UniProtKB/Swiss-Prot annotation:
It comes from the Bacteria. Belongs to the NhaA Na(+)/H(+) (TC 2.A.33) antiporter family. InterPro entries: Na/H_antiporter_dom_sf, NhaA. One of its GO terms (molecular function) is sodium:proton antiporter activity. GO terms for cellular component: plasma membrane. Keywords: Antiport, Cell inner membrane, Cell membrane, Ion transport, Membrane, Sodium, Sodium transport, Transmembrane, Transmembrane helix, Transport. This is Na(+)/H(+) antiporter NhaA. Na(+)/H(+) antiporter that extrudes sodium in exchange for external protons. One of its GO terms (biological process) is regulation of pH. It is found in: Cell inner membrane. Gene3D superfamilies: Na+/H+ antiporter like domain (1.20.1530.10).
Length: 439
Protein backbone atom coordinates (compact mmCIF):
# COMPACT_ATOMS: atom_id res chain seq x y z
CA UNK A 1 0.00 0.00 0.00
CA UNK A 2 2.75 2.44 0.89
CA UNK A 3 4.43 2.23 -2.51
CA UNK A 4 1.06 2.72 -4.23
CA UNK A 5 0.57 5.83 -2.12
CA UNK A 6 4.02 7.02 -3.20
CA UNK A 7 3.07 6.46 -6.84
CA UNK A 8 -0.13 8.48 -6.41
CA UNK A 9 1.77 11.32 -4.74
CA UNK A 10 4.37 11.43 -7.48
CA UNK A 11 1.99 10.98 -10.41
CA UNK A 12 -0.07 13.98 -9.29
CA UNK A 13 2.85 16.38 -8.94
CA UNK A 14 5.97 14.85 -10.45
CA UNK A 15 5.64 16.07 -14.02
CA UNK A 16 4.83 19.65 -12.98
CA UNK A 17 7.53 19.64 -10.28
CA UNK A 18 10.12 18.22 -12.69
CA UNK A 19 9.26 20.85 -15.30
CA UNK A 20 9.57 23.60 -12.68
CA UNK A 21 12.92 22.20 -11.56
CA UNK A 22 14.16 22.08 -15.16
CA UNK A 23 12.93 25.63 -15.87
CA UNK A 24 14.71 26.91 -12.74
CA UNK A 25 17.97 25.26 -13.85
CA UNK A 26 17.69 26.65 -17.39
CA UNK A 27 16.87 30.12 -16.01
CA UNK A 28 19.97 29.98 -13.81
CA UNK A 29 22.19 29.02 -16.76
CA UNK A 30 20.74 31.79 -18.95
CA UNK A 31 21.10 34.46 -16.26
CA UNK A 32 24.65 33.33 -15.38
CA UNK A 33 25.66 33.99 -19.00
CA UNK A 34 23.73 37.25 -19.46
CA UNK A 35 24.53 40.91 -18.74
CA UNK A 36 22.71 40.59 -15.40
CA UNK A 37 25.13 37.88 -14.20
CA UNK A 38 26.69 40.27 -11.62
CA UNK A 39 23.24 40.81 -10.08
CA UNK A 40 22.78 37.02 -9.93
CA UNK A 41 26.14 36.63 -8.18
CA UNK A 42 25.29 39.44 -5.78
CA UNK A 43 22.04 37.65 -4.93
CA UNK A 44 23.92 34.41 -4.21
CA UNK A 45 26.41 36.19 -1.93
CA UNK A 46 23.87 38.38 -0.11
CA UNK A 47 24.33 37.99 3.67
CA UNK A 48 21.35 37.06 5.83
CA UNK A 49 20.51 37.92 9.43
CA UNK A 50 17.97 36.47 11.84
CA UNK A 51 18.69 38.31 15.07
CA UNK A 52 17.28 37.21 18.42
CA UNK A 53 18.78 39.81 20.75
CA UNK A 54 22.54 39.59 20.22
CA UNK A 55 22.21 36.10 18.73
CA UNK A 56 22.15 35.55 14.96
CA UNK A 57 20.64 32.17 14.08
CA UNK A 58 21.94 32.43 10.50
CA UNK A 59 25.64 32.53 11.31
CA UNK A 60 28.46 30.05 11.11
CA UNK A 61 31.98 30.48 12.44
CA UNK A 62 31.24 34.08 13.36
CA UNK A 63 30.16 34.96 9.80
CA UNK A 64 26.66 35.50 8.43
CA UNK A 65 25.28 32.87 6.08
CA UNK A 66 25.08 33.97 2.47
CA UNK A 67 21.96 33.28 0.40
CA UNK A 68 23.48 30.28 -1.38
CA UNK A 69 24.64 28.84 1.97
CA UNK A 70 21.22 29.40 3.54
CA UNK A 71 19.54 27.50 0.70
CA UNK A 72 22.14 24.70 0.52
CA UNK A 73 22.69 24.27 4.26
CA UNK A 74 19.32 25.46 5.59
CA UNK A 75 16.41 24.90 3.23
CA UNK A 76 17.93 21.71 1.84
CA UNK A 77 17.80 20.31 5.37
CA UNK A 78 14.02 20.26 4.89
CA UNK A 79 14.52 18.32 1.66
CA UNK A 80 16.71 15.80 3.48
CA UNK A 81 14.12 15.61 6.28
CA UNK A 82 11.57 14.59 3.64
CA UNK A 83 14.03 12.07 2.19
CA UNK A 84 14.57 10.67 5.69
CA UNK A 85 10.81 10.34 6.26
CA UNK A 86 10.43 8.48 2.96
CA UNK A 87 13.34 6.17 3.80
CA UNK A 88 11.91 5.44 7.26
CA UNK A 89 8.48 4.66 5.78
CA UNK A 90 9.97 2.33 3.19
CA UNK A 91 12.05 0.56 5.86
CA UNK A 92 9.01 0.10 8.11
CA UNK A 93 6.25 -0.93 5.71
CA UNK A 94 7.42 -0.31 2.16
CA UNK A 95 9.65 -1.82 -0.47
CA UNK A 96 12.68 -2.01 1.84
CA UNK A 97 10.83 -3.58 4.78
CA UNK A 98 11.97 -7.15 4.10
CA UNK A 99 14.93 -8.88 2.48
CA UNK A 100 12.72 -10.31 -0.26
CA UNK A 101 11.47 -6.86 -1.24
CA UNK A 102 14.71 -4.97 -0.76
CA UNK A 103 17.21 -7.42 -2.28
CA UNK A 104 16.99 -6.50 -5.97
CA UNK A 105 16.71 -2.69 -5.54
CA UNK A 106 19.56 -2.80 -3.01
CA UNK A 107 21.80 -4.78 -5.37
CA UNK A 108 20.90 -2.51 -8.30
CA UNK A 109 21.65 0.59 -6.21
CA UNK A 110 25.04 -0.82 -5.17
CA UNK A 111 25.97 -1.25 -8.82
CA UNK A 112 24.56 2.18 -9.57
CA UNK A 113 26.83 3.73 -6.95
CA UNK A 114 29.97 1.67 -7.61
CA UNK A 115 30.25 1.89 -11.41
CA UNK A 116 29.90 5.71 -11.65
CA UNK A 117 32.76 6.04 -9.16
CA UNK A 118 34.89 3.67 -11.27
CA UNK A 119 34.08 5.64 -14.44
CA UNK A 120 34.85 8.92 -12.68
CA UNK A 121 38.18 7.63 -11.34
CA UNK A 122 39.18 6.36 -14.79
CA UNK A 123 38.95 9.95 -16.06
CA UNK A 124 40.02 11.75 -12.86
CA UNK A 125 42.33 9.28 -11.08
CA UNK A 126 43.14 9.70 -7.37
CA UNK A 127 45.52 12.60 -6.78
CA UNK A 128 44.52 14.47 -9.93
CA UNK A 129 42.70 17.79 -10.00
CA UNK A 130 39.03 17.12 -9.37
CA UNK A 131 39.48 13.65 -7.89
CA UNK A 132 37.56 14.70 -4.76
CA UNK A 133 34.37 14.85 -6.84
CA UNK A 134 34.12 11.09 -7.37
CA UNK A 135 30.86 10.86 -5.34
CA UNK A 136 29.02 13.37 -7.57
CA UNK A 137 27.58 10.85 -10.10
CA UNK A 138 26.49 8.34 -7.42
CA UNK A 139 22.97 9.67 -6.80
CA UNK A 140 19.62 9.25 -8.57
CA UNK A 141 17.05 12.04 -8.34
CA UNK A 142 13.79 10.28 -7.35
CA UNK A 143 11.43 13.10 -8.27
CA UNK A 144 13.07 13.89 -11.61
CA UNK A 145 13.42 10.26 -12.73
CA UNK A 146 9.84 9.39 -11.78
CA UNK A 147 8.71 12.58 -13.50
CA UNK A 148 10.23 11.37 -16.77
CA UNK A 149 8.74 7.91 -16.22
CA UNK A 150 5.31 9.47 -15.61
CA UNK A 151 5.37 10.89 -19.15
CA UNK A 152 4.76 7.33 -20.41
CA UNK A 153 1.58 7.03 -18.37
CA UNK A 154 -0.15 3.66 -18.02
CA UNK A 155 2.32 1.94 -20.36
CA UNK A 156 4.76 1.61 -17.46
CA UNK A 157 4.23 -1.54 -15.34
CA UNK A 158 3.85 -0.83 -11.63
CA UNK A 159 6.82 -3.14 -10.93
CA UNK A 160 9.14 -0.79 -12.86
CA UNK A 161 7.93 2.24 -10.91
CA UNK A 162 8.44 0.36 -7.65
CA UNK A 163 11.91 -0.80 -8.71
CA UNK A 164 13.03 2.70 -9.74
CA UNK A 165 11.66 4.26 -6.55
CA UNK A 166 13.22 1.61 -4.31
CA UNK A 167 16.74 1.68 -5.77
CA UNK A 168 16.64 5.50 -5.83
CA UNK A 169 15.80 5.46 -2.11
CA UNK A 170 18.82 3.20 -1.47
CA UNK A 171 20.87 5.64 -3.58
CA UNK A 172 19.70 8.42 -1.28
CA UNK A 173 20.89 6.44 1.73
CA UNK A 174 24.28 6.05 0.05
CA UNK A 175 24.44 9.75 -0.76
CA UNK A 176 23.56 10.68 2.82
CA UNK A 177 26.29 8.40 4.17
CA UNK A 178 28.81 9.93 1.77
CA UNK A 179 27.89 13.45 2.91
CA UNK A 180 28.08 12.47 6.58
CA UNK A 181 31.37 10.57 6.35
CA UNK A 182 33.41 12.44 3.75
CA UNK A 183 32.20 16.03 3.79
CA UNK A 184 32.64 16.84 7.46
CA UNK A 185 35.69 18.56 8.94
CA UNK A 186 36.92 19.98 12.24
CA UNK A 187 34.13 18.29 14.19
CA UNK A 188 33.20 20.01 17.47
CA UNK A 189 32.02 17.15 19.65
CA UNK A 190 30.41 19.43 22.24
CA UNK A 191 27.77 20.54 19.73
CA UNK A 192 27.27 16.96 18.57
CA UNK A 193 26.79 15.74 22.15
CA UNK A 194 24.07 18.34 22.81
CA UNK A 195 22.38 17.46 19.51
CA UNK A 196 22.52 13.75 20.38
CA UNK A 197 20.89 14.42 23.76
CA UNK A 198 18.10 16.35 22.04
CA UNK A 199 17.56 13.46 19.60
CA UNK A 200 17.30 11.04 22.54
CA UNK A 201 14.87 13.41 24.24
CA UNK A 202 12.69 13.58 21.12
CA UNK A 203 12.78 9.79 20.76
CA UNK A 204 11.49 9.17 24.28
CA UNK A 205 8.95 11.99 24.06
CA UNK A 206 7.63 10.36 20.88
CA UNK A 207 7.53 6.97 22.61
CA UNK A 208 5.39 8.49 25.38
CA UNK A 209 2.76 9.48 22.83
CA UNK A 210 3.61 13.09 22.01
CA UNK A 211 2.77 13.66 18.35
CA UNK A 212 2.89 17.45 18.05
CA UNK A 213 4.76 18.08 14.79
CA UNK A 214 5.49 21.72 15.63
CA UNK A 215 7.30 20.67 18.80
CA UNK A 216 9.52 18.23 16.89
CA UNK A 217 10.27 20.82 14.19
CA UNK A 218 11.16 23.58 16.69
CA UNK A 219 13.63 21.26 18.44
CA UNK A 220 14.78 20.24 14.95
CA UNK A 221 15.75 23.86 14.20
CA UNK A 222 17.85 23.92 17.39
CA UNK A 223 19.53 20.67 16.34
CA UNK A 224 20.14 22.10 12.85
CA UNK A 225 21.96 25.07 14.37
CA UNK A 226 24.09 22.74 16.51
CA UNK A 227 25.04 20.71 13.42
CA UNK A 228 25.80 23.93 11.53
CA UNK A 229 28.36 24.84 14.20
CA UNK A 230 29.66 21.29 14.69
CA UNK A 231 31.50 20.67 11.42
CA UNK A 232 29.17 17.83 10.35
CA UNK A 233 27.09 18.96 7.39
CA UNK A 234 23.87 20.48 8.73
CA UNK A 235 21.57 18.66 6.29
CA UNK A 236 22.34 15.39 8.08
CA UNK A 237 20.37 16.76 11.05
CA UNK A 238 17.20 16.58 8.94
CA UNK A 239 17.73 12.93 8.05
CA UNK A 240 18.31 11.92 11.68
CA UNK A 241 15.32 14.00 12.83
CA UNK A 242 13.11 11.95 10.49
CA UNK A 243 14.00 8.78 12.39
CA UNK A 244 12.72 10.13 15.72
CA UNK A 245 9.41 11.38 14.27
CA UNK A 246 6.76 8.93 15.57
CA UNK A 247 5.50 6.49 12.94
CA UNK A 248 2.63 5.19 15.06
CA UNK A 249 -0.70 7.07 15.02
CA UNK A 250 -2.49 7.98 18.24
CA UNK A 251 -5.67 6.24 17.06
CA UNK A 252 -5.86 2.72 15.66
CA UNK A 253 -7.54 2.43 12.24
CA UNK A 254 -10.09 -0.09 13.54
CA UNK A 255 -11.06 2.16 16.44
CA UNK A 256 -11.19 5.12 14.05
CA UNK A 257 -13.70 3.37 11.78
CA UNK A 258 -15.78 2.37 14.80
CA UNK A 259 -15.67 5.94 16.12
CA UNK A 260 -16.68 7.43 12.74
CA UNK A 261 -19.60 5.02 12.38
CA UNK A 262 -20.81 5.89 15.86
CA UNK A 263 -20.45 9.63 15.19
CA UNK A 264 -22.28 9.45 11.85
CA UNK A 265 -25.05 7.36 13.40
CA UNK A 266 -25.55 10.10 16.00
CA UNK A 267 -25.34 12.96 13.49
CA UNK A 268 -28.31 15.30 14.08
CA UNK A 269 -30.75 15.46 11.17
CA UNK A 270 -32.42 18.78 10.36
CA UNK A 271 -34.63 20.06 7.58
CA UNK A 272 -33.17 19.23 4.17
CA UNK A 273 -33.52 22.81 2.92
CA UNK A 274 -31.27 24.30 5.61
CA UNK A 275 -27.89 25.63 4.44
CA UNK A 276 -26.58 26.40 7.94
CA UNK A 277 -25.20 23.70 10.23
CA UNK A 278 -26.39 23.52 13.80
CA UNK A 279 -23.99 23.69 16.74
CA UNK A 280 -24.58 19.98 17.35
CA UNK A 281 -23.69 19.14 13.74
CA UNK A 282 -20.53 21.26 13.89
CA UNK A 283 -19.52 19.52 17.13
CA UNK A 284 -19.94 16.09 15.49
CA UNK A 285 -17.92 17.17 12.44
CA UNK A 286 -15.14 18.43 14.71
CA UNK A 287 -15.10 15.00 16.36
CA UNK A 288 -14.62 13.44 12.92
CA UNK A 289 -11.88 15.96 12.09
CA UNK A 290 -10.07 15.30 15.37
CA UNK A 291 -10.25 11.54 14.91
CA UNK A 292 -9.00 11.87 11.31
CA UNK A 293 -5.98 13.85 12.53
CA UNK A 294 -5.19 11.23 15.17
CA UNK A 295 -5.39 8.25 12.79
CA UNK A 296 -2.63 9.70 10.56
CA UNK A 297 0.82 9.19 12.06
CA UNK A 298 3.09 12.24 12.51
CA UNK A 299 5.53 10.65 10.05
CA UNK A 300 2.96 10.36 7.24
CA UNK A 301 1.32 13.68 8.06
CA UNK A 302 4.63 15.58 8.01
CA UNK A 303 5.72 13.83 4.82
CA UNK A 304 2.47 14.88 3.15
CA UNK A 305 2.82 18.46 4.44
CA UNK A 306 6.40 18.82 3.15
CA UNK A 307 5.94 17.48 -0.38
CA UNK A 308 4.48 20.68 -1.82
CA UNK A 309 7.00 23.04 -0.22
CA UNK A 310 9.96 20.86 -1.20
CA UNK A 311 8.88 20.17 -4.78
CA UNK A 312 7.56 23.61 -5.68
CA UNK A 313 9.75 25.95 -3.63
CA UNK A 314 12.90 24.48 -2.10
CA UNK A 315 14.14 22.34 -5.00
CA UNK A 316 13.48 25.01 -7.66
CA UNK A 317 15.32 27.54 -5.46
CA UNK A 318 18.17 25.07 -5.04
CA UNK A 319 18.34 24.54 -8.81
CA UNK A 320 18.26 28.29 -9.44
CA UNK A 321 21.21 29.07 -7.16
CA UNK A 322 23.31 26.02 -8.07
CA UNK A 323 22.76 25.37 -11.79
CA UNK A 324 24.25 28.63 -13.05
CA UNK A 325 26.84 27.11 -15.40
CA UNK A 326 29.07 29.71 -17.07
CA UNK A 327 29.51 28.63 -20.71
CA UNK A 328 32.48 30.83 -21.58
CA UNK A 329 35.90 29.23 -21.48
CA UNK A 330 35.62 26.46 -24.09
CA UNK A 331 37.78 23.60 -22.81
CA UNK A 332 37.46 24.85 -19.25
CA UNK A 333 33.68 24.30 -19.41
CA UNK A 334 33.89 20.57 -20.03
CA UNK A 335 37.30 19.60 -18.69
CA UNK A 336 38.10 16.27 -17.10
CA UNK A 337 35.65 16.83 -14.23
CA UNK A 338 32.73 17.61 -16.55
CA UNK A 339 33.49 14.55 -18.67
CA UNK A 340 33.90 12.34 -15.60
CA UNK A 341 30.58 13.42 -14.05
CA UNK A 342 28.62 13.16 -17.31
CA UNK A 343 30.15 9.77 -18.17
CA UNK A 344 29.58 8.53 -14.63
CA UNK A 345 25.89 9.42 -14.78
CA UNK A 346 25.26 8.24 -18.33
CA UNK A 347 27.48 5.17 -18.66
CA UNK A 348 28.39 4.29 -15.07
CA UNK A 349 24.84 4.38 -13.76
CA UNK A 350 23.48 2.40 -16.70
CA UNK A 351 26.19 -0.27 -16.56
CA UNK A 352 26.08 -0.64 -12.78
CA UNK A 353 22.31 -0.88 -12.42
CA UNK A 354 21.85 -3.16 -15.43
CA UNK A 355 24.78 -5.50 -14.74
CA UNK A 356 24.15 -5.94 -11.01
CA UNK A 357 20.42 -6.54 -11.63
CA UNK A 358 21.19 -9.03 -14.42
CA UNK A 359 23.73 -10.84 -12.23
CA UNK A 360 21.40 -11.07 -9.21
CA UNK A 361 18.63 -12.56 -11.35
CA UNK A 362 20.90 -14.92 -13.30
CA UNK A 363 22.45 -16.46 -10.17
CA UNK A 364 18.90 -16.75 -8.74
CA UNK A 365 19.62 -14.51 -5.79
CA UNK A 366 16.30 -12.80 -6.47
CA UNK A 367 13.58 -13.28 -9.12
CA UNK A 368 12.85 -10.81 -11.90
CA UNK A 369 9.83 -8.68 -10.92
CA UNK A 370 6.66 -9.31 -12.94
CA UNK A 371 6.41 -6.91 -15.86
CA UNK A 372 10.17 -6.32 -16.02
CA UNK A 373 12.09 -7.42 -19.12
CA UNK A 374 15.73 -7.00 -20.07
CA UNK A 375 14.68 -4.36 -22.59
CA UNK A 376 12.66 -2.18 -20.26
CA UNK A 377 15.29 -2.66 -17.54
CA UNK A 378 17.73 -0.90 -19.88
CA UNK A 379 15.42 2.13 -19.98
CA UNK A 380 15.06 2.19 -16.19
CA UNK A 381 18.84 1.86 -15.80
CA UNK A 382 19.28 4.91 -18.05
CA UNK A 383 16.79 6.90 -15.96
CA UNK A 384 18.96 6.03 -12.96
CA UNK A 385 21.51 8.45 -14.45
CA UNK A 386 19.24 11.41 -13.66
CA UNK A 387 21.32 12.63 -10.73
CA UNK A 388 20.37 16.30 -10.65
CA UNK A 389 19.57 17.39 -7.06
CA UNK A 390 21.91 15.35 -4.87
CA UNK A 391 24.64 15.38 -7.54
CA UNK A 392 24.62 19.21 -7.63
CA UNK A 393 24.58 19.20 -3.84
CA UNK A 394 27.65 16.95 -3.61
CA UNK A 395 29.38 18.99 -6.35
CA UNK A 396 29.09 22.09 -4.16
CA UNK A 397 30.46 20.18 -1.18
CA UNK A 398 33.33 18.79 -3.27
CA UNK A 399 34.55 22.02 -4.82
CA UNK A 400 32.63 25.01 -3.44
CA UNK A 401 33.99 28.53 -3.85
CA UNK A 402 37.62 27.35 -3.60
CA UNK A 403 37.58 25.67 -7.02
CA UNK A 404 35.17 27.70 -9.19
CA UNK A 405 36.41 26.27 -12.50
CA UNK A 406 36.08 22.66 -11.32
CA UNK A 407 32.68 23.41 -9.77
CA UNK A 408 31.48 24.88 -13.07
CA UNK A 409 32.71 21.77 -14.89
CA UNK A 410 30.93 19.54 -12.38
CA UNK A 411 27.67 21.46 -12.81
CA UNK A 412 27.96 21.15 -16.59
CA UNK A 413 28.58 17.41 -16.20
CA UNK A 414 25.55 16.99 -13.93
CA UNK A 415 23.26 18.91 -16.28
CA UNK A 416 24.48 17.20 -19.46
CA UNK A 417 24.57 13.73 -17.89
CA UNK A 418 21.09 14.18 -16.42
CA UNK A 419 19.56 15.47 -19.67
CA UNK A 420 21.15 12.73 -21.80
CA UNK A 421 20.19 9.97 -19.34
CA UNK A 422 16.63 11.22 -19.08
CA UNK A 423 16.22 11.66 -22.84
CA UNK A 424 17.72 8.28 -23.76
CA UNK A 425 15.82 6.49 -20.99
CA UNK A 426 12.55 7.99 -22.18
CA UNK A 427 13.25 7.08 -25.83
CA UNK A 428 14.19 3.48 -24.97
CA UNK A 429 11.12 2.96 -22.78
CA UNK A 430 8.85 4.58 -25.36
CA UNK A 431 10.14 2.08 -27.93
CA UNK A 432 10.12 -1.10 -25.82
CA UNK A 433 7.00 -0.63 -23.68
CA UNK A 434 3.84 -1.97 -25.35
CA UNK A 435 1.07 0.48 -26.18
CA UNK A 436 -2.04 -0.41 -24.22
CA UNK A 437 -5.15 -0.65 -26.36
CA UNK A 438 -8.07 1.48 -25.30
CA UNK A 439 -11.16 -0.49 -24.41
Amino acid sequence: MTILRTMRNFSSMNIAASILLFVAAIAAAIIANSPVAPVYQEFLLHELHLQIGNFNLLSHGGENLRMIEFINDGLMTIFFLLVGLEIKRELLVGELSSFRKAALPFIAACGGMLFPVIVYMSICPPGSAGSQGLAIPMATDIAFSLGVLSLLGSRVPLSLKIFLTAFAVVDDIGGILVIALFYSSHVSYGYILIAALLYVLLYFIGKRGTTNKIFFLVIGVVIWYLFLQSGIHSTISGVILAFVIPAKPRLDVGKYIEHIRHTIAGFPVVESGSIVLTNEQIAKLKEVESASDRVISPLQSLEDNLHGAVNYLILPLFAFVNAGVVFSGGGELVGSVGMAVAAGLLFGKFAGIYFFTWLAIKIKLTPMPPGMTWKNLSGIALLGGIGFTVSLFIANLSFGANYPVLLNQAKFGVLSGTILSGLLGYIVLRIVLPVRKRK
